């Protein structure tokens, strides 16, 4: 039998059976919930503040469930880790569906025992504005990977950053700059960062908004020339592609912003890393790799991706021509034309979104390699060249999911396709987007930064 659900307008007090120890004696688990609300700014975000009588807990989490979900629903609930350093243990419940009922309880560990509160009813969630229209076509329901997709409206209007759950429902949304290329939660999952595409170097914008919508900053100083993409790093740092000089397709800088607003140019993305195409550069995607503190960077003009250490040391080049390449014998020439989103895993699996020359009617491809990257050599073996179901000469993304599925984002055609390990379609979300990033929950570091 489920626990009784309580909802009181003011403070909520509840005692569960004695658990934990306080000075060596059993102590009752008496919880006080001082705030139980949904955010006024983003009404799919729950806000809970609480306390536990007696000895403070050493760890805690809040577990919630949606009331009466349909049988096919994947997003039925979740759990939020509690930051015990925050006042009143303030915790946000993220990933809630619009206009839905939820119940939650608190689990707190102290003295080697777990205190579990009764269930409390969260106020009904509200409707999101802006919230794009999304249609979903499911081919293999049992093969869907639970989780969330963090994305943006791309080049469509109205502009927004938003999050989809695995059912195709929008569970979070906020205003975004015009033509937002990437929206991405920071490493701690506290803020949503966004960057405008700014493809022709005429002025861009980076901004962020907290996940409850209460804190925001537009037009981040010093990043007015940011373009296309950003990536997040531990410690609240954000790294962005920034045009180095005025003009058409110049080199870029990788600029890292710290939480205190300090900007640091880590390195230039230009002839020091690879040869331009007829003197033109166009870096268009970047990802931070926590497993060896490095970055992968894509450039559509010379049709290549490079891997660079956080201090600017070139590791390898994949794609383009190797004649005179700064990577030397750590270069693997390839014949594809135009590339954007990509994903490098720690085991050497590498996936690339290959746009092709769409003025010739080319269909987008997803190319998978197995990279062998050692101190002595670098090689790339082709594993798969998947012919996609969309076309578009800019943007586009790909990500390998933990369960073996692959998420393909056709930004121009306005669809995100989940494929099973055999490259069969699992489901398709039809919605106009920029780049897109999957994550299993909305807490903690992303699986692909």
Regions found by a protein language model. Name each.
Residues 20-22:
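Bacterial signal peptide processing site
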Residues 37-41, 57-59, 101, 107-449:
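Histidine-/acidic-rich catalytic cores in large beta-rich domains
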Residues 3, 34, 46, 76-80, ...:
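Generic preference for well-ordered secondary structure
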Residues 24-127:
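Short, surface-exposed linear motifs at loops/turns and structural transition points
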Residues 8-9, 71:
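Intrinsically disordered, low-complexity segments enriched in polar/charged small residues
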Residues 1-8:
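Bacterial N-terminal signal peptides that target proteins for export
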Residues 15-18:
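C-terminal motif of bacterial Sec signal peptides marking the signal peptidase cleavage site
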């Amino acid at each position: 039998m489920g626990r009784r659900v309580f909802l009181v307008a003011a403070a909520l007090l509840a005692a569960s059976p004695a658990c934990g120890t306080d000075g060596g004696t059993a102590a009752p688990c008496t919880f006080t919930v001082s705030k139980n609300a949904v955010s006024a700014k983003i009404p799919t975000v729950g806000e809970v503040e609480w306390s536990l009588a007696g000895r403070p807990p050493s760890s805690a989490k809040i577990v919630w469930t949606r009331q009466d979900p349909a049988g096919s629903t994947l997003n039925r609930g979740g759990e939020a880790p509690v930051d015990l350093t925050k006042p009143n243990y303030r915790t946000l419940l993220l990933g809630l569906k619009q206009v839905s009922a939820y119940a939650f309880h608190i689990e707190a560990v102290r003295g080697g025992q777990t205190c579990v509160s009764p269930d409390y009813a969260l106020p009904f969630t509200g409707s999101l504005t802006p919230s794009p229209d999304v249609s979903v076509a499911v081919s293999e329901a049992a093969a869907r990977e639970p989780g969330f997709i963090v994305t943006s409206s791309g080049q469509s209007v109205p502009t927004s950053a938003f999050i989809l759950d695995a059912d195709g429902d929008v569970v979070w949304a906020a205003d975004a700059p015009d033509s937002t290329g990437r929206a991405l939660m920071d490493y701690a999952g506290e803020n949503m960062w966004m960057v405008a595409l700014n493809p022709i170097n005429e002025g861009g914008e980076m901004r962020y908004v907290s996940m409850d919508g209460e804190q925001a900053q537009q037009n981040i100083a010093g990043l007015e020339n940011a373009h296309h993409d950003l990536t997040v790093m531990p410690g609240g740092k954000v790294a962005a592609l920034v045009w180095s000089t005025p003009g058409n397709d110049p080199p870029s800088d990788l600029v890292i912003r710290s939480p205190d607003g300090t900007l640091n140019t880590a390195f230039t993305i230009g002839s020091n890393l690879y040869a331009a195409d007829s003197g033109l550069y166009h870096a268009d995607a970047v990802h931070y790799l926590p497993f060896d503190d490095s970055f992968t960077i894509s450039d559509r003009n010379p049709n290549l991706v490079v891997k660079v250490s956080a201090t600017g040391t070139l590791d390898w080049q994949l794609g383009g021509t190797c004649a005179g390449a700064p990577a030397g014998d750590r270069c693997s020439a390839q014949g594809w034309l135009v590339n954007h989103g990509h994903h490098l895993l720690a085991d050497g699996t590498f996936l690339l979104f290959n746009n092709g020359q769409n003025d010739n009617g080319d269909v987008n491809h997803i190319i998978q390699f197995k990279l062998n990257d050692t101190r002595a050599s670098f090689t790339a073996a082709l594993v798969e060249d998947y012919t996609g179901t969309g076309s578009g000469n800019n943007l586009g993304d790909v990500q390998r999911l933990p369960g073996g599925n692959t998420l393909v984002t056709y930004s121009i055609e306005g669809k995100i396709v989940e494929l099973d390990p055999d490259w069969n379609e699992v489901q398709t979300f039809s919605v106009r987007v920029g780049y897109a990033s999957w994550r299993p929950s909305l807490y903690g570091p992303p699986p692909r930064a």
